[in-house]
């Protein structure tokens, strides 16, 4: 029997409000504890990527998102328990009217609402998230031309 070392599936979401602000979370746990992150996490068995990110958003922010749209994916290596876990990180977007019902919980120590001009990829501690934020900002800039 041959075993293929395939990546684990993980999700993250760019959640914006009607003012165009981005909802980020401050990581409560290592790796990259204390840095900014996007709501998201590993998918559970028997759930779609969309179900997984909607669940993670609810767990980390308390926000009930009804729909997400797929943006892009990035390969990643996630340090966990002394291991290097290869992941396929799937990035989504969601829009909400406001963040008034949001509350930090689960892996999120704090919620951080960022105005578009205050979003800096380097503030996001995990490499794939850092890359994704840069890519997302470039897309936004191109859309506004």
Positions of PLM-derived features:
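Acidic, metal-coordinating catalytic segment for phosphate/diphosphate chemistry
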Residues: 1-13
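Conserved Nudix-box catalytic region and its N-terminal flanking loop in Nudix hydrolases
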Residues: 17-59
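A generic structural signal for short beta-strands and their flanking turns/coil linkers
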Residues: 9-11, 21, 32-34, 66, ...
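Conserved positions in beta-strands of structured domains
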Residues: 14-16, 71-72
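A structural microfeature
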Residues: 24, 69-72
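Charged phosphate-binding loop/patch that engages nucleotide di/tri-phosphates or the phosphate backbone
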Residues: 129-145
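Unchanged
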Residues: 43-67, 74-128, 132
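Conserved hydrophobic "DFG−1" position in protein kinase catalytic cores
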Residues: 15-16, 24, 94, 113
């Amino acid at each position: 029997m041959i075993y293929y070392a395939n990546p684990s599936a993980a999700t993250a979401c760019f959640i914006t409000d009607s003012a165009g602000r981005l909802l980020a979370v401050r990581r409560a746990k290592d790796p990259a504890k204390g840095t900014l992150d996007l709501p998201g996490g590993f998918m559970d068995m028997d759930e779609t990527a969309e179900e997984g990110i909607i669940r993670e958003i609810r767990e980390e922010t308390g926000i009930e998102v009804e729909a997400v749209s797929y943006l892009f994916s990035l390969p990643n290596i996630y340090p966990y328990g002394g291991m290097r876990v290869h992941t396929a990180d799937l990035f989504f977007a969601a829009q909400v009217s406001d963040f008034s019902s949001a509350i930090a919980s689960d892996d999120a120590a704090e919620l951080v609402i960022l105005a578009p001009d205050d979003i800096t990829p380097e503030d996001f501690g995990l490499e794939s998230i850092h890359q994704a934020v840069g890519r997302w900002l470039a897309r936004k800039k191109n859309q506004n031309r």
